[in-house]
Amino acid sequence: PEEIEDKLNSLPLVSECLVIQSGEKLIALVHPDYDEVHKAALSDEELQKQMEANRRELNAMVNSYEQISGFRLYEEEFEKTPKRSIKRFLYADAEI
């Protein structure tokens, strides 16, 4: 998932993300760059549309088995370890 996350993190309005598996599907958990969202004066609906555009753009860059089938936005930054890596285990069972 790290390769997919690196690509997703480079897309517009993404501050950080985490890719998890839900059944057979990959789901992106995304913390948007709210500073950029506010600068662009985007509504929640426009933010959702941009994230869907990001999902489609990402899926065009990766193999079919790496494609993201959905995403969920997180308002808060993900919890991190002292080394600043995301505590993945906290989000493994995230509801989509």
Question: Language model features by range: what are they?
Answer:
Residues D6, P12, P82:
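Short alpha-helical basic/polar micro-motif
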Residues Y34-A41, A92-I96:
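Short alpha-helical interface patches
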Residues P1-K7, E36-E46, N63-I68, S85:
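Adenylate-forming
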Residues S10-Y34, N59-A60:
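C-terminal boundary motif of the adenylate-forming
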Residues Q21, D33-H38, E76-K80:
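A short, flexible beta-alpha/helix-coil linker loop
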Residues E16, E24, R55-I96:
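Conserved C-terminal "lid"/linker of ANL adenylate-forming enzymes
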Residues D44-R55:
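Well-ordered, non-membrane alpha-helical segments in soluble/globular domains
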